Amino acid sequence: MKAETMFKDYNKMKREMAFLELQLQSFTGLSVEDMITSMTFTGEPEGDRVQTSGASDKTCSIALDYRKRLAQENADYYRFLYDKYAEIKKEIDFFENGIRSLGEKKADIVFEMLDGDLTWDEISTQYGISRTSLSRARKAAIDYLDRLYAQRERMEIEYMLS
């Protein structure tokens, strides 16, 4: 991922990560009713059918299998949510650590720009620097972060090739 993209998507990713975290914390999974409904035959049978026993093979199969399938579906869905959360968290953590490595004052300025709560004029007044200096600081941060992303990518490639 590129630094410029992270600058644009940072707040959206933070919101998505918080949403996924909440989903994971309050995970209840599929209900038994939803699982049984998904396992039942939803289409209409073709032609006339005569049933000679009290319970169809499908009904017995559903009764015997639904708990195992429900547990598997819930585990798969939880894993999907967790993997998505972990991927976003990894990107945000890398990005934020890169910003922090700029130094305290520069990092504070960049985080103010990312938060979007203040205008550039308000940030420049708060830190006693010009808008031009803010623009330069943003560009320098993006250049630095792009180098970090390139280094991470090289290390991942090196690992995969070893």
What are the language-model segments listed below?
Residues 1-98, 150-162:
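N-terminal interaction/assembly modules
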Residues 98, 116, 144, 148:
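Mid-sequence acidic-hydrophobic segments that form the walls
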